[in-house]
Amino acid sequence: MSVLPQAGWMQREGLAELVVALGADHMRWVGGCVRDTLLALDVHDVDCATIHLPNEVIRRCKDAGIKVVPTGIDHGTVTAVFKGGPVEITTLRQDVATDGRRATVAFASDWKDDAARRDFTINALYAHPETSEIDDYFGGLDDLDARTVRFIGDARQRIKEDHLRILRYFRFQARFGAEWDDEAVTACEELSATLKGLSRERVAMELLAICALPDPYAAFERMRELGVLAVILPETTPAQMTALQGLIAAEAAQGFAPDPIRRLAALLPPLAPVAETVAVRLRLSRAQRARLMTAAERMGEDAENPQALAYKYKNESAIDRLLMAGADAQLLKGWEAPRFPLKGGAIVARGVGAGPEVARIMREIEARWVSEGFPDEARVLQMLDDALS
């Protein structure tokens, strides 16, 4: 019998009280917290499954003084709120009907039935909260040891139940996988067109999640070869794959964390209108759209003056453009753009009438100020006097 090692997350405030409230024999830690503990990775999200129906979970939590929120009660999920972080509690379920986008579920009482509706074997590991014994119904432990991402049961059937599992497969493969599972790859290729039926928001969420991984290049390249990427991001060509590879290397070499919007920009041609089209299609936020468009334009400016670039585009976008050009962006770490010290009143005080001429002079002096490396106010006033002399 395999046992879950002790880990820091198990000592989070409130978890012991939750186990008492639900009953240790009536709940199991499940999913990512079990998987990542076995891999000695940091655990962020804690989930548990229980035989109790949602209303019973709510009653037990309230009786124990635990704040609980019915976040997805129709699907059997409520969230217990603790200072150490929330815990999602889901009643055992089995699928009654699926249409590739959402499932109709019925509550169950069998742990294996609940495990059977999950996507991958490595995500269907259940751990007893007191004994730490692991229940593994589909060979997830062996797959975890082999770093194999494998669908539970028939891969095609799992994908037909939820088409988003195609993208989830590549995300988990990029994060955990070593060797590719032939059955999974074939199923993803054959059913790739089903991604067209998903909401744009769900596609965007998974796409950006893949982009945020330390090195998603191999996963994206396999997606491109199989035609999966062409369904959700047809703008990507081999040239863009090369750009992504270069960006990943530049981020690593210069100590920048992976950034999903920057990575997405690398997958697009260097054209702002194309980036805008993609942003609209994926329903990105306005801020994400603006940043994607700026990054996609690539470098047109001199990379020798990164601070000038940051003054024009803000730090984040300047870093994007520099890294995508393979240029040094480290100077911008923690850098804050200074405020332009010249006011219109100083120009008017020197005899220039208020109006467009003042604005023109302001722009001229500001450009010189930036090119000289943002000197102090005294130097700016000297520039002004020189310009008016």
Place the predicted regions along the sequence by residue.
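Catalytic cores of the polymerase beta-like nucleotidyltransferase superfamily
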Residues: 1-389
